[in-house]
Amino acid sequence: MAVQAQYLDYVLEQLAGLERMNTRRMFGGVGLYSGELFFGLIDDDTLYFKTDASNAAQYQARHMPRFMPPANRPMGPMGYHQVPADIIEDGETLVAWARQSVAVALASRAKQAAGPRKKR
């Protein structure tokens, strides 16, 4: 889905305190990166951050849905949750939540680099 320039600009303004912030267009949406770490996305003017067991509970407590790819890409729910509107409106808190998602992305990268566990 499309991302309107005004919404993207607003989110980037709110994330101004995040280190090494950059974006890349992808599949009609926008990927959010801290350096080379992919930690979030914007799709259909909705912001999602990467989650795992370390931070998903704060999204689930607010009943925030997980990102679902479009029907033409049936992959099921992904490890990204919608960011609550009140968090987006508070730039400091948004940056704190973004940093948690950057940490999740870093941990995920480390797991992938370690490779699969060998069976004994």
Q: What label would you give each PLM region?
A:
Residues 1-120:
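Charge-dense, helix-prone N-terminal extensions
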